[in-house]
Amino acid sequence: MNKRSFLQNAIKSTAILAVITLVAALFAACTEQKIAFISVDITGADYAKDFTASGTMVDHNGQARSVKDFAGKVVVLFFGFTQCPDVCPTSMAELAEAKKILEKNNKGDGDKIQGLFITIDPERDTLPVLKAYMGNFDPTFLAMRTAPDKLVAVAKDFKTYYKKIPGKTDTSYSMDHSAGSFVYDTKGNVRLYTRYGSGADALASDLKLLLK
């Protein structure tokens, strides 16, 4: 091999190596982005697409709602009930705290977070009750309800569990239910499922990634 051929081959090898390195770097970057979430990544899931798929959902102000209403915001949706003693208030309080963390770190980010609460106890959770309940956490959070028969279909679509636990009287019952939240990106696509007890800091970190 003469000197010229050697140099040409060396240049080609260097170019190929550079391309391989670049592709590897891009792949690594994509992989890191995919595993950056602390919550469970359910991007592309064929469920939990919209809570109106099985019927009308009305917020505590009496307005019909869908995920599309909150385009441009990251939506965090939780299923619960107002007489829940621990899981529900803790989850909503953590979301409110996560929103404050985002706002503190970058002014305006807090306004891009929308908290939603769907009651699994429409018999007792009237619109006035739901509105008062949301006032305990954040004035922008919205609670929603639908008819009991429609709720069954909504829960099925979200793969969410709930069950009435009888009490001593007809009205003293409790509710057993899944403990976690669904998170949608600014385009209304479901992206994450956050487990109960993850904490405000972890939630804020995930929400920040979806705001980018």
Predicted regions and their residues:
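Conserved helix-turn-beta segment immediately C-terminal to the redox Cys motif
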Residues: 73-74, 91-117
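N-terminal targeting signals for export/organelle localization
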Residues: 1-54, 58, 212
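Thiol-/selenol-based redox modules, centered on thioredoxin-like
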Residues: 167-212
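Thiol-based oxidoreductase modules, predominantly thioredoxin-like and allied folds used
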Residues: 109-124, 140-149
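Short active-site neighborhood of thiol/selenol oxidoreductases, capturing the structured segment around
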Residues: 67-91, 95
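Short, acidic, Ser/Thr-enriched surface-loop or helix-capping motifs
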Residues: 59-60, 185
